[in-house]
Amino acid sequence: MKVQPSVKKICDKCKVIRRHGRVMVICDNPRHKQRQG
């Protein structure tokens, strides 16, 4: 999980979602998981 000021899709399978008011990226590739912080 990377915590970044701005989250972006890295590949085609990345999805940008909102969970508990936080913007997150979920993906099949665990290295692409990101959270805005």
UniProtKB/Swiss-Prot annotation:
Question: Which of UniProt's keywords are assigned here?
Answer: Ribonucleoprotein, Ribosomal protein
**InterPro entries registered for this protein in UniProt:** Ribosomal_bL36, Ribosomal_bL36_sp
Q: Per its UniProt record, what HAMAP family does this chain match?
A: Ribosomal_bL36
One of the record's GO cellular component terms = ribonucleoprotein complex
Question: Might you name a Gene Ontology BP term for this protein?
Answer: translation
What's the name of its gene? rpmJ
Lineage here is: Bacteria, Bacillati, Actinomycetota, Actinomycetes, Propionibacteriales
Can you name one GO molecular function term for this protein? Answer: structural constituent of ribosome
Kindly provide the name given to this protein in its UniProt entry.
Large ribosomal subunit protein bL36
Which cystines does this chain contain? none
Task: Describe the family membership recorded for this protein in Swiss-Prot or TrEMBL.
Answer: Belongs to the bacterial ribosomal protein bL36 family.
User: Which domain of life does the protein's organism represent?
Assistant: Bacteria
Cited Pfam families: Ribosomal_L36
